[in-house]
Swiss-Prot record:
Organism of this sequence: Anaeromyxobacter sp. (strain K)
SUPFAM superfamilies (UniProt xref): IHF-like DNA-binding proteins (SSF47729)
Task performed by this protein: This protein is one of the two subunits of integration host factor, a specific DNA-binding protein that functions in genetic recombination as well as in transcriptional and translational control.
Keyword terms of this UniProt record: DNA recombination, DNA-binding, Transcription, Transcription regulation, Translation regulation
HAMAP family associated with the record: IHF_alpha (MF_00380)
Protein name, entry field: Integration host factor subunit alpha
Amino acid sequence: MTKADIIESVYEKVGFSKKEAAEIVEMVFDTIKETLERGEKIKISGFGNFIVRDKKSRVGRNPQTGEEIEISARRVLTFRPSQVLKNALNGEVSDETTEGADDDDDEEGEGDE
């Protein structure tokens, strides 16, 4: 599914004009992007969490030459689906509501990978 497909779906389901649907979808993605750029976690109940993690620099190895190289520190984006989404993907009916279903996905205590 592409961004254009999402815009089309919003247009068909909500009844906004295509221009309005496109503007809304763009605003949502811009907000998500800006939040992640600030390093903040995004938690969408019933869907999942987007988490920015800082990875430390480390020594790696060139697999072709065996030479050691330094891999610089960087930020990585991870997505952790909610249990509700996992169940839906597997065709399971969940008794859980979407409210609070992601509360067990707290990443704060995890270290660098």
